[in-house]
Amino acid sequence: MKLFDYAPLSLAWREFLQSEFKKPYFLEIEKRYLEALKIPKTIFPKSSNLFYALNLTPPCAVKIILLGQDPYHSTYLENDQELPVAMGLSFSVEKNAPIPPSLKNIFKELHANLGVPVPCCGDLSAWAKRGMLLLNAILSVEKNQAASHQYIGWEAFSDQILMRLFETTAPLIVVLLGKVAQKKIALIPKNKHIIITAPHPSPLSRGFLGSGVFTSVQKAYREVYRKDFDFSL
């Protein structure tokens, strides 16, 4: 069995990234991830959602990139069943999952900046379908073990995704929240794309609330696309 047998990837992205899949680094990622699936430990998100961010936002549709670090590693209960919070999109959670503190702060700042009503669920799929790539730098995680899949090497792949997108002619709006995400500035060609930075939305970080980050995103989106991005959920 190959990686894409467990984790489907759309034809558009397969064609866009075709040259990556035979490179040694990617074959090593594939090997390590498939080995991790064989161990009797729970891996999030479920393998069918591993590439959900890519599948919801084709390369030709990407207008905004909101980069995350790695998936949520926690669970929630629904009908007495333990389910993963992570769904394959950065900062987003399953429809019926409790909204995590970082996402609550995102919604608070969005409301303060643009008056967008605070939603009752944390599923950001609608943003992805409108052109916001919600990509995590690390695509998988072990249950209750933050950053546990850093060893798999996902960042080499997500960096290639970003660099391929940065080669496009249309200006992209790249939103980097926190110091870890902001390290990716080194990958972005100068004077070609719009970079917007802010502190991480975690309550453990300071400065995100009141940063005006979504005001900046909307201003940039208007400049490039002559209309507002629809942040409603």
UniProtKB/Swiss-Prot annotation:
Keywords: Cytoplasm, DNA damage, DNA repair, Hydrolase. The active site is at 70 (proton acceptor). This is Uracil-DNA glycosylase. PROSITE patterns: U_DNA_GLYCOSYLASE. InterPro entries: UDG_fam1 (IPR002043), Ura-DNA_Glyclase_AS (IPR018085), Uracil-DNA_glycosylase-like (IPR005122), Uracil-DNA_glycosylase-like_sf (IPR036895). GO terms for molecular function: uracil DNA N-glycosylase activity. Belongs to the uracil-DNA glycosylase (UDG) superfamily. UNG family. The keyword Cytoplasm applies. Excises uracil residues from the DNA which can arise as a result of misincorporation of dUMP residues by DNA polymerase or due to deamination of cytosine. Its main location: cytoplasm. It comes from Helicobacter pylori (strain ATCC 700392 / 26695) (Campylobacter pylori). Its EC number is 3.2.2.27. One of its GO terms (biological process) is base-excision repair, AP site formation via deaminated base removal. It catalyses: Hydrolyzes single-stranded DNA or mismatched double-stranded DNA and polynucleotides, releasing free uracil. It is found in: Cytoplasm.
